[in-house]
Amino acid sequence: MLDNAIPQGFEDAVELRRKNRETVVKYMNTKGQDRLRRHELFVEDGCGGLWTTDTGSPIVIRGKDKLAEHAVWSLKCFPDWEWYNIKVFETDDPNHFWVECDGHGKILFPGYPEGYYENHFLHSFELDDGKIKRNREFMNVFQQLRALSIPVPQIKREGIPT
């Protein structure tokens, strides 16, 4: 039992929360060529990446310079990408936000036919005074495989009541 816990709600650090939320909202609403400047929202040694991959290990891009390079790659491979149905959630830590959203656009990976990619995403943002320290993206990797015309194995789940 937590009888010594003092409930604060999310009324603490109001200005810090506002500043951090503004950064998260800006990140999620950046489109087109403006994506080439999104790395400016990070601290110098910040990182971002995809935490759900076909290998089971995250793809982590570390540092502003590498994040800038990643933006060039991303714009080439996902030229018209946009996030939508964006919902931003605060946590008990004013420096940690979660986002749930959908995303869609062309997918142009070398070696694969052009595809159209749609998925549902979760993003974790850890921030420091309005700058992103770490952004982790989570999605259903099978949807990306389908968009690339890669056959997806089917799992038999007999007996699950639906």
From Swiss-Prot:
InterPro entries: NTF2-like_dom_sf, PhzA_PhzB. Gene3D superfamilies: 3.10.450.50. Coiled coil: none annotated. The keyword Secreted does not apply. One of its GO terms (biological process) is phenazine biosynthetic process. Keywords: Antibiotic biosynthesis, Virulence. Induction: In liquid cultures (aerobic), phz2 operon is induced by quinolone signal via 2-heptyl-3-hydroxy-4-quinolone (PQS). In biofilm (microaerobic), phz2 operon is induced by quinolone signal via 4-hydroxy-2-heptylquinoline (HHQ), a precursor of PQS. Pfam families: PHZA_PHZB. Pathway: Antibiotic biosynthesis; phenazine biosynthesis. It comes from the Bacteria. The keyword Protein transport does not apply. Homodimer. Involved in the biosynthesis of the antibiotic phenazine, a nitrogen-containing heterocyclic molecule having important roles in virulence, competition and biological control. PhzB2 (operon phzA2B2C2E2F2G2) has a role in the biosynthesis of the phenazine during both planktonic growth and biofilm development, and in host infection during biofilm development. Belongs to the PhzA/PhzB family. This is Phenazine biosynthesis protein PhzB2.
